[in-house]
Regions:
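Juxtamembrane transmembrane-helix boundary motif
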Residues: 1-22, 29-45, 61-196, 235-311
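Short, low-complexity cationic-aromatic patches
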Residues: 25-27, 202
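Generic alpha-helix structural propensity
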Residues: 27, 31, 47-50, 54
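Short active-site-proximal "capping" loops at secondary-structure junctions
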Residues: 37, 52-57
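Membrane-interface alpha-helices at helix entry/exit sites of multi-pass transporters
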Residues: 41-51, 73-76, 212-224
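Short hydrophobic/aromatic, small-residue-rich stretches within specific transmembrane helices
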Residues: 50-54, 130, 221-225, 247, ...
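Short secondary-structure transition/capping segments
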Residues: 56-59, 229-230
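Structural signal for alpha-helical transmembrane segments and their flanking helix-loop junctions
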Residues: 185-236
């Protein structure tokens, strides 16, 4: 019972955040961030948990949107799939965090390889160009993550609330998709810094408001931001030596919500939903008025009672 009472808040945070996002159009990571902060997450706990949640949850999303057969894998087709599985087991025996991240990284790369192959060969960027964009985004995510430790614990909730307001303002101001093409890439890179600082991944909002014509970065943004978040997740672990086991249970709750209710589909023509923006702004303002107290995440017994998850 002690274990269940410890993981239940995380599971419910993922589930309720996903369901609320599904029916309002608010970005899922925004909802879960507010849930985590309301649970009492401290800044370092929060950013580590959010990066973990984003990487794992969008692995679930992309694996459903791009269904793949083992034989069609690019890097490890067929029986070769045993190679990353065995490596995952070996890494998990040494360091569970590294093992888990490697597992997700492997399958995300397979999914993104499929997405890359499906792009128009004449307009898709080179693999080197994608790598360059991932590195730039990863540096920005890591810088944001490194700055988290300098934010006073009692005021970190303001970072989350203000970030949501910034996203809402940008979505409101960028309704004309034919304008802003010159600075859209700068905005996308700036969003990766906000991801590292707040844990909010605005991919669904940003891709819904893509410019016309669309830039190379915009076309590949899901690949770029997820690659950057994986690197940022590893960097956060190196800096803070903190692994949020609870975030994994939040991911499970989110996966259940996605399976039961699906995902909100933003329209790709016209302006962004004013109703969604209104709800997001209201949620952010109410949240900042509440002023959650950073008492720390609930302790998951498994993380303390066994050496396997002793970080």
């Amino acid at each position: 019972m002690e274990m269940l009472s410890a993981i239940a808040p995380f599971f419910m945070a993922g589930l309720l955040g996903t369901v609320f996002a599904r029916f309002t159009g608010i970005n899922m990571s925004m909802c879960v961030l507010l849930m985590f902060l309301y649970m009492g997450a401290k800044p370092v706990e929060c950013i580590a948990a959010m990066l973990m949640f984003n990487v794992f949850t969008y692995f679930t999303v992309y694996s459903q949107l791009h269904v793949m057969k083992i034989k069609s894998f690019t890097f490890f087709p067929g029986v070769r799939l045993a190679i990353p599985i065995l490596i995952t087991i070996a890494l998990a025996a040494l360091n569970p965090f590294i093992g888990i991240v490697f597992f997700v990284f492997t399958f995300l790369m397979e999914i993104f390889a499929k997405i890359y192959k499906e792009m128009d060969a004449k307009s898709r960027p080179t693999k080197g160009k994608i790598g360059q964009m991932v590195v730039i985004a990863a540096v920005l995510v890591t810088i944001g993550t490194a700055l988290v430790q300098f934010v006073p614990e009692n005021y970190y909730y303001i970072v989350g609330g203000v970030t949501i307001l910034i996203y809402a303002f940008v979505m409101w101001r960028t309704g004309d998709r034919r304008k802003g093409t010159a600075w859209w890439d700068k905005l996308l890179y700036a969003s990766t810094f906000l991801t590292g600082l707040s844990g909010i991944d605005g991919t669904d909002w940003l891709t819904a408001m893509r410019r016309n014509p669309e830039s190379v970065l915009s076309k590949c943004y899901p690949i770029v931001i997820n690659g950057a978040m994986i690197i940022g997740l590893l960097a956060s672990y190196a800096m803070y030596q903190y692994f949020s086991l609870g975030a994994l249970f939040a991911t499970i709750g989110s996966a259940v919500g996605i399976r039961l209710f699906g995902l909100y589909e933003h329209k790709e023509k016209g302006s962004f939903s004013y109703l969604t923006l209104g709800i997001a702004v209201l949620a952010a303002l109410v949240f900042m008025i509440i002023q959650p107290v950073p008492t720390g995440f609930p302790v998951v017994p498994m993380a303390d009672q066994t050496g396997f998850f002793d970080f």
